[in-house]
Amino acid sequence: VKQTKGELYDYLKAHDCLLFLNESNADLVDMARQREMNRIITYGQSDDANVRGEVIDCAPFLHFSWTDLSTTESKARTYEVESHLIGAYNIDNMLAAITIGLHFGVTPEQINHALESYVPANNRSQLEVTAKNKLIVDAYNANPSSMAAAIENFKLMNVEHKMAILGDMRELGEVSALEHQKLVDK
């Protein structure tokens, strides 16, 4: 995954393209620094991000605030979003969408409306309620980091009975079993 992202960064640098960078991800920040990327707009939960977000609550859906710090400080305004996504780990995806939307001239109000209206139906961060259970479905195209984030979120849920069912990570090939074991060992 890192190698492929590195190739993407190399392409962006070679073609003088803009990079939307998750400032909260040290690996991605290091890759950008190593390549001396010049055209960057950052987002994340760090104080250095151009678009900064903060989790307010996650019971069960992600509720967060965000601020566009790329505007002048006197014009910076904080907005709140109540999403239909499970897990604090989804804030990075939401902040990426916000950052790209702002770059292309979408208003904060339009962005918030879109984020609050989005209800996942693609096996990502879905809450399914049955007669006896609540199921969190987060199964589409899992990888070690996304699965670890989902498990951490699952651990934080304050419920009497819970069970996790982990699917395959077939794209990992021969190391799939090892990566599953690492998750179980945590």
Residue ranges of predicted features:
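Active-site beta-alpha connecting loops in nucleotide-dependent enzymes
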Residues: 120-123, 139-186
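Acidic, Mg2+-coordinating active-site environments of NTP-dependent enzymes
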Residues: 1-134, 159-160, 185
